[in-house]
Amino acid sequence: YSCPGHTPGEMIFIDSKTRYLFCADACNRNLLLMQSGDHTEGRYVSVEKAAKAMERIVSMKDQYDHVINSHHDYRGFGAPLADYVVDQALECMKKIVDGTAEIREIPDPLQLNATKTVAVYGDVFITYSKEGVYETR
């Protein structure tokens, strides 16, 4: 299934036998929404569009019991995401879109002595650009 968010072409897969949702980078506790580049270049996903994709994942909960993602977030190796992460990611995106998200500056582990701005809801942090909240009309 198409699930734009981390990247425009993000895909998720459900294994109906094991009832696992494999979401790659579409959902985790420290989610980066891909917002570099020009809107027309196909390298951009708004928070608004990512929230719609996340709503789809939530609406499919009757088809999966566990979520496996690509990036490790201090769980035991190979362990699924906590049950609440998908819901918290969606709620965080909704709060970004409606302007009520809790915003924090946190250390950026990818850059020396730098911080990044994130929206926080529960245990979920979402990195996004202020210019990238809404779909262009």
Give each language-model segment a name:
Residues 52-137:
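Accessory terminal helices/loops
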Residues 2-4, 8-84:
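Metallo-beta-lactamase
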